[in-house]
Amino acid sequence: MINWTKKDKEFLYEICEKLRDQVPFTFSRFGDGEWLAISQAQPDGINCDGNKYYADLGKRLEEIISKKQDYYIGHQNVNAYTLRKDYLQDWVNSDIFHELSEMQGLDYIFDLLNSVHVVYIGNESLSPLPFVDEFIEIPYNNVWDDYDNVLNEIKNKINDNIHKTFLLSAGMACEVFVHDLWNFNKNNTYIDVGSVFDPYVGKKTRSYHHRLQHVSNIFQL
């Protein structure tokens, strides 16, 4: 059972307000995969999506997390591998959207995203999401191999005349993407949404996806 703290509820309310009002922000999410990449505890391993724990990716992630950032950085509430205590950040709940999906569905989030200009960066299966205005297709895993090209493609979507909300499903590289994009242009919103929308395109890639009761209320293939 999910029990949100007062801080969790306030955080969700705050970012939903910012989405609605098109106030720029960035939301980065550090989970066990990011920490394993940083620690290089499994240098030849891969995460659940087949993404490699690249040493140079781990180095970038550590550089980012070692400095206090001016954007939201999330940490999982679940009991998983973490190095959080070694890094000073104003940690928020990284799974706030995932937990909302499990608790009541994402109807409200879909409505919010339908009201703004969304650029989605993800694998081909996510392109049918109904709120997407522009889509950048990336591989199902290991986008880090083509990081610079993808970053430039995303930057080319930035338009000084319109606020855009960039949603990224790009594995552990997400945290580097949103960091570099935020520091390139702080007039847009950049969110690591992870796998939260997978069930809404018919893909159950996480164990909690099998428990969802509200997916069909929003979108069906």
Predicted feature descriptions by range:
Residues 173-221:
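C-terminal functional extensions of proteins
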Residues 157-162:
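Glycine-rich phosphate-binding loop signature in dinucleotide/nucleotide-binding domains
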Residues 77, 136-139, 194:
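Residues at the C-termini of beta-strands that transition into short coil/loop
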Residues 112-154:
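Redox- and metal-dependent alpha/beta enzyme cores, enriched for Fe-S-associated oxidoreductases
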